Each structure stands twice: as structure tokens, then as C-alpha cells.
Amino acid sequence: MKQICILGSTGSIGTQALDVIEQHSDRYEVYCLTANNRYEMLAEQARKFRPAAVVIANEAHYESLKLLLADLPDIKVYAGAKAIDEIVEAHPIDMVLTAMVGFAGLSPTIHAIKARKTICLANKETLVVAGDLICRLAAEYHVNILPVDSEHSAIFQSLVGEGDNEIEKILLTASGGPFRKFTLDEMRDVKAADALRHPTWEMGAKITIDSASMMNKGFEVIEAKWLFGVEAEKIQVLVHPQSIVHSAVQFRDGGVKAQLGVPDMRLPIQYAFSFPERLPLNGDRLDLFRQPLEFFEPDMEKFRCLAMAYESIRRGGNVPCVMNAANEVVNEAFRHDRCGFLQMADIIEATMQRATFVAQPTYDDYIASDAEARRIAASML
């Protein structure tokens, strides 16, 4: 019986992970659940899955959460970022699903790696911000990082059985988001409500906006570089509106292996939990007769965030960290009508130019770079 800790259990990935665990309760148990603000939902989940502990990151909700679980004294209730860092180190935990959003996922991921827990990585910002550090730590502590993003899971699945066979190219697919066919003038006037209508995936608000700007795909290019040791020049983004081909790998003999399936995040979540085994999963099955499969080149002029992600890789150092911090600021501002859709890329680019460059950042440098970039980006709103 594997004991699982879910960081961000009330979000889109977290709730779907709990669905997987419920379907396979003979194999998986929830040891710990964490959330940022949604203490009522966290309490409901705790009542259903009976973890050993729950943690609410926002300490203002600690008393409310404790009150809601007062009749369940076996469930320990904690609060704060430090408590999350500590809980992932708990001895019974086998796997940590990092499903929390943004830079906040970095510290608990590092603590979990140092405690030699298997990492099921859904928090892509961890590798965007500090990919070099995370990969070095994973190697040092002999920890497996299993991708949960559908695209990276597809690449991972395509590499099973390939051993040391050389990757010639990674084909990273993108839906193109809701504004794929918009002109720049049309994109100038879009609002958060428009961007939150993703054509194929059900996701949280932050990642849905990142998908609309294609910053999410830029993050995934960086994530793929670190997970699979492939230079950015060998990672090609393909716009694939149907989101059926989740990604593919081309090998040096010209052969291509891809993973296909209906858009359902429970599949990559479950694969990370069960690897190398495949377990049954309730849900829709792929019907290739229902629709054609289309592929297009991304428009880097319209979707500048994707171009900036490649640029951040080229520049290296702390630049991806700076880009991520600026993006978190403008993404939130756009969702609250304090920033225009195209203005997001302007502010991110300006922040990348103005922030202090650090060629070989330490963990403390990442913390400082994140804070500096947030200040710079916020000053332009």
C-alpha cells in the first residue's frame, strides 16, 4: 500500500488524483493533504480520505480548519509554508504529488527530494525556476521524478524501453488555446473570462491563462529540457487543437513514438502513481473516427511568451526564474482586470531585461530573483 502526500489537493490536479486513489483504494492511501486557501474543501477531503495530517498554507485559516475537523482528533492539523516543508519529510510517505501552483512548489519539492520521496511532478514551475538544482538534487539523493503533465508523461511513456537510444527531437504538442485563430487586434481586447474558456482541458485558473498566452507551453519546453536532458533546439512545439496526440519522440533512425488518448489528466496522474504498471481507469476511450488530427506551427509573433521561454533558456542562469515570477504577477493581474492580455508579454519581457542576472544561481539566489522580479513586474501595472 503506497502512502501518498498531495500538495495542492483542492486544485484541478489534486482532486483528479484523489479520484484515482479512490478507484484504487486497495493500492493507495492518502497520508497528507495540503491546500492554500480552500480550508472548507480541504476539510471535506479529509473527512472522506482520513489522512494522517492536513496542512493549510494560509495560516489565517488554521483555526477554522481545526474547528471543522475537531471531531476527528486522529487527523493532525497544521498551517504555514514551513509545515508543508516538514510534512513531506514524514517517514511513512512513499510519493509526493506536487500539484500546488507556482513558485510555492519549489521549497517542498526540495524537502521531499532530500527525504528521498518519489516525486510525481505536476508543479512545472519548480523545473522552470530551478531545473538545474532540482535535477542535481534528484541525482544526489537517487530520487525518481515522474512527470504528471500530460505532454511530459507522453514523452516519458514514449521513452519506455528505449534505453540509451538517442533522441533526435521531441515533438511537444499544444492545443493552441482559445485565441489560436485570433488576430493581434482581437487579442488586445480579450478579458479573463474569454481566456478561461479552454477548448479541450479542464484546468485551474492560473494554468488556463498561461495556456491562452502559450506561456504554459514555454514552461513545458523548459520542463522537457530538464526532465529528458534535451537541448531546447531539439524541442519542437506543434499546435494540435484536438489534444489527442499528447506528445511524441523522434529517434535518430527517423522513427517516431507518440502517446495518444482522450484529454483526461487522470491518466498521466495514475501512470505516475503506478509506473511501470498500467492499472484500469474508468473514463472515455479514444475513438479515432470521430475527428481529424491537425497540426500547425505556433505563431511566435502572436504568442510572444513562447518565444520568451526559448530566449530564457538561451540566456540561462536565473532568467527563467525571473520570467516565471513576472508571469505569476501579470497572470494574477489579468485575472483581476488590472492588466491587458498582450500587456502581459510586454511586462514579462521588460522584467527579464531589468532584473539582476545571476549566471549560476544558488537556492538563495532563486528566492532573491523571484522577489526582485515580482517587484519590477508589479511596478509596471
Go through the PLM ranges and name each one:
Residues M1-L381:
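Catalytic, metal-anchored helix/loop core of enzyme active sites in primary metabolism
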